[in-house]
Amino acid sequence: VERYLDALDQEIAGVAKLLGVRKKIAQVHFGGGTPTFLNHSQLRRVVEMIHSCFDVQEDGEWALEANPRVTTNKQLELLYELGFRRISFGVQDLDPAIQKAINRNQTVEQSWRTLETARNLGYKSINMDLIYGLPLQTRQSFRKTLEEVYKMRPDRLAIYSFAYLPGMFKTHKRAIREKDLPSPEEKIAIYLETIRFLAEAGYVMIGMDHYALPTDELALAAKNRTLHRNFMGYTTLHNMAQIGVGVSAISDFGDSYWQNTKEIDQYMNEATEKKLIPRKGMKLDEEDLLRRDLIETLMCHGEISITDFETRYKIEFQDHFSQAWKKLEQFKQEGLVNLSLEKIELTHVG
């Protein structure tokens, strides 16, 4: 771990030097797994790395991902002391049989303990991540999970669709039995039941897969149409460069993306020798920027104004997206979108 932190220190210092004038940071996010794997002195060290190279805004946001199975009360206390105020707990599902099927055993009591500890310490926003479409999951079983989560009353919920890609992921995902997965019809039913349940529970649907209490800033941003989405998820921040550091980290500079190597030994060797080179990258052209804008608008607001895009990008929408328009007409017949010459609007099923 110390060798990895040495490499991380070198990368952060190198990025700061490359950017020139000492930059201000609006948000710091510890993610990519379980940062609480680090001990207290290691966590302090990472935070000190950031402060030594950048100025975090006075109202800057510190957020992290944590695993209730391994996160201790002492860690939560330390992280709060270091400035973290937003925390996201990966729960996935609370049904013991489903947890066993995905090799992630976690009791309801563990989730309760970590959430209540964070709340009592003063964390201002607590999120839970759930996943629908997991093996052995049904509408009834997932509703029970939602009922338990509702009792905990997190500020936000992220409810993601499970993607079964056995060739791309770790051993425990390859071990999942395909026959145990819910059918596409059952998966859609779980999704629609989730929307209904959370609406009745007082949560506002944010974009495609997030929910928040009405007073949460994401809910307010959605209401005011100032919500945005980047590769990290939904945010109230806009036009902010994202600098990713660490193994496999992704950076976004508006019209370009790049990613560090996913090989940890390679990362440590290159970063320590100050020879770290991105392994993937993409520069967006005008067409890419147009399509990204369309996708983000749909994901944030569930609809797009065709006339607005025609004016801003100087295009004839149906001509420019002639192939996609044929698909949209098909989706309209299937009840996935509402379609007119002025607007494209997603339905709940869509």
What are these regions (language model features)?
Residues 316-332:
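Short amphipathic alpha-helical interaction segments
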Residues 330-342:
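A short, conserved structural fragment
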